[in-house]
Every structure is written in C-alpha cells, then in structure tokens.
Amino acid sequence: MFEEAKDRAQYLDTLRAQGQLAGPLHGLPVSIKDNFHSKGTEATIGMVSFLDEVSQENSPLVDILLKLGAVIYVKTNVPQTMMVSWPLTSNLKLLTKFCLILDR
C-alpha cells in the first residue's frame, strides 16, 4: 500500500507541475481504518479469519477519496469486529488506543 501511495503522490506531483489538480484533496495523505476495502489489501476488521482475504475492489469511500485527489498511504488498526470494549484489542496487532484516554 505504501509503494502505491508513493507512486500516486509522484503522479499527483506531475499533475501539479502541469498546473492541474486531481481534486480538492489533491495530494492529501489519508489513512483509512482496517474495515475499509482497498484493492490489493486485507480488510480484516481485526479478525484473524479475514487475514488472508485480499480485497478485489475498493470500498465506495476509498473510491471517493481517490477521486477527490487523496493519497491513501496506510490502514490503521481497529478493535476486533469494530466493537468498542475495554481494552480495545485485536488478535492481529497491538493494543488499540483511545485517543482521548491513552491509559485505557
């Protein structure tokens, strides 16, 4: 995903050098949560059972962001099944932190 983001950023730089913009979010780096499908990546929603299922297409939100000129460069961790419970954990990655209360 990161390599594709670098390629997209270079393409957007080329457009900008020609005086063109891809949209109102031209070149803005955007992260998406792991519940959104991005072609060629997994959308696990924090579940091990989805780890090897590679998305064949983008979620509508991802397509909208790309159409507006964003650069999607990373997917961020989510608690298992997107359910909010304490602690926010996933069997795939490290502890998911709550941004307002970091000790939880």
Outline where the language-model segments fall.
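Gly/Ser-rich catalytic/binding loops embedded in alpha/beta enzyme cores
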Residues: 1-104
